[in-house]
Structure formats: structure tokens, C-alpha cells
Amino acid sequence: MLQLIGKGTTQKQQIEGGQKVKKAGIELSIYFMPGAGGKQYTEKNAIDTANVINAVNPDFVRLRTFVVKSDSLMYDIVKSGEFTECSDIEKLLEIKIMLEHIQNCNGYLASDHIINLLQNVNGYLDKDKNAMLDYINTFLALPRKTQRKYQIARRMGFAGDWTMLDKLSMHYQYIIEQYEKNVSDGKQFEKLLNQYMDNYI
């Protein structure tokens, strides 16, 4: 995975470096990019990241959802067919897999960027892990129509969760309803979401 995205380090080097930082008493954050491996490496990306977290026990794990920005080198790679981007939901599933594989860690998981689909996935990995997984599973169990409405709202900058969609203005509720109804093709729907996310990266 690290070689695929040109990180310039190995998993072993990241673990050794992280352990040295922790031993020195310096606050450490590990960033997880769900979707960075594309569809081909989605599970590997999640499990490999969990293994590093387990070995290092960082103070923070910060979520930074991977998005392919238009007119970027990665965008050209996607168009060439060499890389297949994960859907919004698949990236969320990656976060779930990562969480499920984290053990004996007490750092804080922070969904602290607007690019993340669920901003309320926050908590301590020892005390709040099950609650975070329950929150993700609750969203995944929603009717697809509700998920899609929330995805559109979130990508338009909505800071609440799906239980608060009725707090949006009638204008935005109408726009979201029209998008949800008229953009039925899955690829076109993901393209719509990415157009909004382009504004944040």
C-alpha cells in the first residue's frame, strides 16, 4: 500500500519511527486514508493500518478520506483504468474494518475533516470502539434512499448527521430530493459527490 501511493517508507519503518516518537514522550498522530488503495486493496489498506496502530498505539488516529481530485495525476490514472476508486460507502466500510482490527490501544480516533462522510465517528479506541462501530453500522443499515440523501447533504457541507436532515432549509431539502431522485446511476452519483468534494481538497 505504501509503495502504491509513493509514501517513501515501509510499514516496518513507520512502526519503528512511531514507537521512537512515543518513547520520547512526543504526541503522535497516525493518519488513515480510507480508499487510498482503491477497490483492489480496500481490505488490505484497513488491516495494514490497524496493524501499525496496534504496534504503535498513537495518541490520535485521524481520518482523511481519500478523494481523487479532478485534473490531478491520480485522476489521469483513474481514467486510464489503472486505479478504480472506492465508493463513498466502501470507504466507510474500510473505516469499519480498520476499527474491528484495532486491539489494546487507548488513543483517540478523530473524524476531524469535512471530507469524511461521518463526522461523528470520534472516541477513545479502548472505551468507545463499540459505540463507534454501532454508529457506523446504524448508517449502513439505513434505507439506501436515506443514505443517498445524507451523502449529498454532507458533500454539500452539512455538518449534522442523517437524523438532522429535516433541519436543512426547504431550498436545500428540495435540491437534495431532486438529486436523489434524478441521479440513479451509481457511477454518476459518485461523480456528483466527487464534484462537491473537489471544493475541499
Q: What is the predicted function of each stretch?
A:
Residues 54, 60, 68-201:
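Auxiliary Fe-S-binding modules of radical SAM enzymes
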